[in-house]
Amino acid sequence: DTVSVAEISSFQLETIEYFHPQVSAILNITPDHLNRHHTMENYVAVKEAITMNQTKDDYCILNYENEYTRNFGDRCPATVVWFSSARRLDNGLFYEGEDIYLAKDGNVQRLMNVKTDMNLVGICNIENVMAAIGIAMSAGVPMKNILDTIRRFVAVEHRIEYVATKKGVVYYNDSKATNTDAAIQ
């Protein structure tokens, strides 16, 4: 079997007709590309289109802490896998203390410690890791393989890339951030 993983832009989502991902994800929706989409409502609708051909047999990973993705959860045609960086969830992935947990069917399992098991910093990367866990487990990847991969993963160039520490201040290069919300996170 061949698995393809692709980031689909809102521009590409405007023209999809038959695209049917088995697993999709919307990590966040913030004001962006409004020069093209004109209103936030239009932009949100285009982002949600990634699920238009999905069914309950498919999965959509959504960020519970983003107002737009949280509101979409009830309308989403796929089985939703939530993640949260700010609260404990009854079902889904969540970050609490320094750990990432998976809550499912009344059981809570500690998956990893972000300080010792991740080579990335920042809440945005914790959210990215939770989304990646949700995507991979929904695709049937064994949890051990997922966690081993996360432990080995290092930051890529221009994405919260460590530069130096001077006089107790840590400097990072995050020049790939495409909007103010991305830079702040």
Q: Residue ranges of each PLM-predicted region?
A:
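Residue-level detector of flexible, active-site-proximal loop/helix-junction positions
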Residues: 12, 87, 107, 167
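Nucleotide phosphate-binding/pyrophosphate-handling subdomain across enzymes
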Residues: 115-185
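Flexible active-site lid/hinge loop adjacent to a nucleotide/diphosphate
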Residues: 1-86, 93-96, 101, 113-120
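Acidic-glycine-rich active-site phosphate/pyrophosphate-binding loop
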Residues: 94-112, 156-164
